[in-house]
Structure formats: C-alpha cells, structure tokens
C-alpha cells in the first residue's frame, strides 16, 4: 500500500466505516455550502466504491442513486447503476431510478490517470461536462450541483459553462483533498430556469419601470431589468447576471 494512503483521512475512514477517504471531502463541502439537506433526492456520478453515497444518505435520509462504470457493492437504501455517465442510456436509467427530478447532482468522477497532465485534464473536463449535462436534465429548477475537475487550461471555460446555468457558483478545495492533487470542486447553487442566459443579446421594448426607477422588459414572461431605460423605448440589450426570478441587462443600442 502506498505510504500516502495511510494519511489522517484514510485512517479516519477505516475507523468510521466509510468506503473511501473522499467521504470527508463531501462532508467538508456540504458543511460549507449546504447543498444536501434532509430529504434531498441525490444523484451521485462516479460513485464507486461508495464513500460519497454513504455521506449523501446520512445527510439526506432520502432517495440516493449512485452510478459508476464499476459495480458498486450494495448499500442499504441506495439504488446503484453500473453505467457510463457520458452515455444517453445511462441518463435514462438514472431518470427511471429517480422517478422524478433530483434536488442535487454530485460528481466525483475521475478518469484513470495517464500521468500526462494535458490528457488527464481533458478527460476530466469531458466527465465534468457529462455531469453538467445530466444535472441540467435531471435537476429541478433551484437544484444544486457539485463536480470535481482537474485543473488546467480548460478550467475557466468550464467554470463559465456552469455559471451560465446556476445563480451562484464557487470553486473550492476542501481540506481533505491531498495537497499534491490537481483537483478542485465546483459548486453550483440554484439551477436557473430563466429563458435567458448571461451574454445573450436581445431586441426588446421596455414595458414598465421597476421600484428602483430602472426599465423592465419582459422576455418570454421573464423580467429583465435595464438600467437607464424608459417605458416604450426599443433597445438592443445584453443580458448580464441572471437570477432565479429576474435578470439584469445593459443597453447596447437604442433602436
Ligand atoms: C475518485 S472515484 C469516486 C470516489 C467516490 N466519490 C467515493 O467516495 O467512493 C472516481 C470514480 O469515477 C468513475 N468513473 C470514471 N469515468 C466514469 C464514467 N465515464 N462513467 C461512470 N463512472 C466513471 C471511476 O470508475 C471511479 O470509480
């Protein structure tokens, strides 16, 4: 056994009956960001051997579905699926097991490491994108997402992709991550159900004035707050920060 496997968290996991030391990463992330709550329906991607599943079940007490390429030894109260998270058929299997929408999608999926930084980073980004795709399809509006990513030059683009879908996004390395590890966890809270996304451009007519004196344009029934705009004005706007119930936009051009 490698020496570094016998660290503090490794021994603690053995003592406390967790299948993997990574259990403590999920505990620490959840202590800080409170993504899994009592009753949450949780999907865990790349879940073998099952440390995160044990913690997710303790925290939620509700439906927990675990997916991995490898077989996961049965755990009480947890549905396990052997499948590839990059495949559509696996998503369908997870949806059937859930029988509804998920409150939280978590992914600790990691490729087999080749030792070549760029290759491992690219494979990790592929898995993180697959996890985001699944989260977008299975989460209820307002649901939360947690995903592991190996750092590298595609990380910032990936972070932007997550930011487009969630109202608040953080990147965090828990104390239980090994010092030498390139991993970082991205936490997305409050999946957006808005019909607009940050950076999009629209031509709109300002409908009304909000309480703060800014103009309000409606896009597919969704309120977009436009600074320095007056009712009746026809504008080309660029969407800025998007929240659950409204978005902000700036004026590009008066039409
Ligand atoms: C670090 S381990 C997960 C540890 C787990 N969170 C725990 O606490 O026990 C990463 C897992 O991702 C899985 N994995 C990698 N690629 C996958 C894929 N395409 N589909 C499903 N699982 C995958 C691996 O088989 C591996 O079990």
From Swiss-Prot:
**The keyword Signal appears for this protein:** no
Work out whether the entry's keyword set contains Transferase.
yes
Q: Which SUPFAM superfamilies would you find in this protein's record?
A: Nucleic acid-binding proteins, S-adenosyl-L-methionine-dependent methyltransferases
Q: What class of enzyme is it?
A: transferase
A cellular component annotation (GO) from this entry: cytoplasm
Q: Which family does it belong to?
A: Belongs to the class I-like SAM-binding methyltransferase superfamily. RNA methyltransferase RlmE family.
Q: Which PANTHER family match?
A: PRE-RRNA 2'-O-RIBOSE RNA METHYLTRANSFERASE FTSJ3 (PTHR10920:SF13), RIBOSOMAL RNA METHYLTRANSFERASE (PTHR10920)
Listed HAMAP family: RNA_methyltr_E (MF_01547)
Its recorded name reads: Ribosomal RNA large subunit methyltransferase E
Q: Which organism is it from?
A: Methanothrix thermoacetophila (strain DSM 6194 / JCM 14653 / NBRC 101360 / PT)
Q: What is the lineage of its organism?
A: Archaea, Methanobacteriati, Methanobacteriota, Stenosarchaea group, Methanomicrobia
Q: Which gene encodes it?
A: rlmE
